[in-house]
Amino acid sequence: MGYDFKSVEKKWQDKWEETGVFHAVDFSEKPKFYGLVEFPYPSGAGMHVGHIKAYSGLEVVSRKRRMQGYNVLFPIGFDAYGLPTENYAIKTGIHPRKVTDMNIERFSSQLKKVGFSFDWTRVIDTTQEDYYKWTQWIFLKMFEHGLAFRDKTLVNYCPSCKVVLSNEDSQGGKCDICHSDIVQKSKDVWYLRITKYADKLLEGLDEVDYLPNIKLQQRNWIGKSTGAFVDFDVKGSDNEKLKIYTTRPDTLFGVTFMVMAPEHPMIDKYADRIANMDAITEYRKECAKKTEFERTQLVKDKTGVKIDGLSGINPVNGKEIPIYISDYVMMGYGTGAIMAVPAHDTRDYEFAKKFGIDIIEVIKGGDISKEAYTGEGECVNSGFLDGIKNKKEAIEKMADYLSENGIGEKGVQYKMKDWAFNRQRYWGEPIPIVYCPHCGMVPVPYDELPLKLPKVENFEPGSDGESPLAKIESFVNCKCPKCGADAKRETDTMPQWAGSSWYFLRYIDPHNDKAFADKDKLKYWGEVDWYNGGMEHVTRHMIYSRFWHKFLYDIGEVPYDEPYAKRTAQGLILGPDGDKMSKSKGNVVDPNDVVDEYGADVLRTYVLFMGDYEKAAPWSKSSVKGCKRFIDRVWALQDILTEGDEYSKELESAFHKTIKKVSEDIEGMKFNTAIAALMTLLNDIYNKGSINNAELKTFVTLLNPFAPHVTEEIWATQNYGGMLANGHWVDYDEAKCVDDEIEIVTQINGKVRAKLMIPAEIEAAEAIELAKKDPAIAAAIEGKNVVKELYVKGRLVNIVVK
């Protein structure tokens, strides 16, 4: 009988939904398992095979854990606010609400068609009022605790999307959404003070089970550095000091100039004392046209203007040094000014060479007439540091000197900056703040949340860069919640990252209208046991969500400090040509096409069999067909089925070994080798020519997490009772996983001459005698003097002859 996957798969998907077999149960006495995958952004393109691979890993783990007796929470939802939907809506004229609803319906249908065991009663959508009410609530809590604030600053602005972007969303000088060049623009911006949590975010990494590369990326992203703040007197000012931060205070004697950011406020303050203010003004105009990426490129030509009228005084030797402005120094980084040690910094060296500035060696080891020396060495030309060869010792000694003399102090800086948290677009969570002429910024009262996104027809961004909400008088004009006076609402919306910063908490209690989640349920489900997703999200999204969670923990809203106990990641699925899939290359594989042609079980099995789960692998249609043949052969096992409620003698060891292998490999995310073990066992079964009921039950149980439809159908066809989805995982006997016989090699003078099978627990002398009786070995040593005999257990016999 042939296997009709189309009718079988639909049948079981309907049955799983009808019975609610995948519904998580709050407060169950079973051990709990919370498995989390990154909820998708429901784009118009629909799901791609990368989504299938991303979800299939924990899908397999979750199905196995259910059969092991766990109460499993494996939820799904939709991260649906953001620019892609809004840009599509503007392009097509279809309202973003309608676009979002259509896309979510399509994604849901696709996910169900693949047979994922999600709990569909807990679905969340970040654009629904009952969800973003709590996003706004958390924002107001941050505002209340001083973590949400507004400041005027230069921002990364995308002229195409007409939106302000965070540094993280504009890396490489390009908009993360449309890939246009970004520009710098002065604007009032909402920030979240994530830097206040920098140390907590770093320390928390020691307590979690993340892949080493994920921890490394997060540490690098936060970018903690230790050094010193140093005060330089500014000659020409009213006794002002220019504060800088350096990780190398031991090189202070080598400072020969300073550089300010073109936007530094000291320039405007003393404009009337600066002789070349016209040249500086022109240079500042040029800088304003450049992106942050363009300004900080290491390989670009060095530009700058010397400030005539202000100069610095080196605090350790009293020397007067020039101050320049240059575009590579940014106001948003450090203090907006740097000290320059050209002998030992490549960028400073190039700048000094171009502008004819002194270069003084303070660390021996290089030839500074040719290039900066950036290595370690003995301190020279450095007063009280001369002769010190240990960098750490020199840094400590200088830091102490700065402190003792009141000219500096030890300090810490972070590469990570406070999070720009507003967008001038329609499709996002409204920021619940009111501007009152008398009271200033006033939060919308908690009991008035959600502040609803108004339903409008014109949602296009303004040419002035203001939010579309600014045009809606009925939304903007309001009364101050504090004094009742006429007031204006904030018209910017939150970035797409807002809703995804706490979604894992809402899954725990998605229908609660009194709190974002019940505290007893939060205690029961605890932190996410296992989170899997893409490597592209291990910095921004994960750091943002860890920050939100730690804040909620600090104010007593969640009972545990870290949101995710474990984090893993899957590799990309590449196109058949080995390149990254993209529409422009025409190498995109639609999962719907695979399901329609081969079935969901084949797709599920293939994406996990195609290679190491954590690494990228190209799509191969021939391998897909191989998985189809595998599923068909599994179905055909029923044709060679015999009676029997115990493993046959011939297959007993193979079954126990496979149970162990598959069980361990699923937990280790070695899905490809787990499937390979099942394929090997299948071959063993066919070589034997028959399979009994005990063996078939075990085989389909092991395969079920990977291919649930065909295995459920076999289980039901054979009247084994119940459903595999809530069946029992199989155990193995460790003693029966050990081979009775093993294959070893026999060497003569180190060269392999024969292979033979011997008992696994044989004594050395007996193993050597058996080896010598092998015809090939006997012939090779005949007439020769045996000098030495060695048995390496389980591996080889080596005979040395002369």
Task: Label every model-predicted segment.
Residues R63-N71, K91-R97, K113-S117, E144-R150, ...:
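Secondary-structure transition/capping motifs at alpha-helix termini
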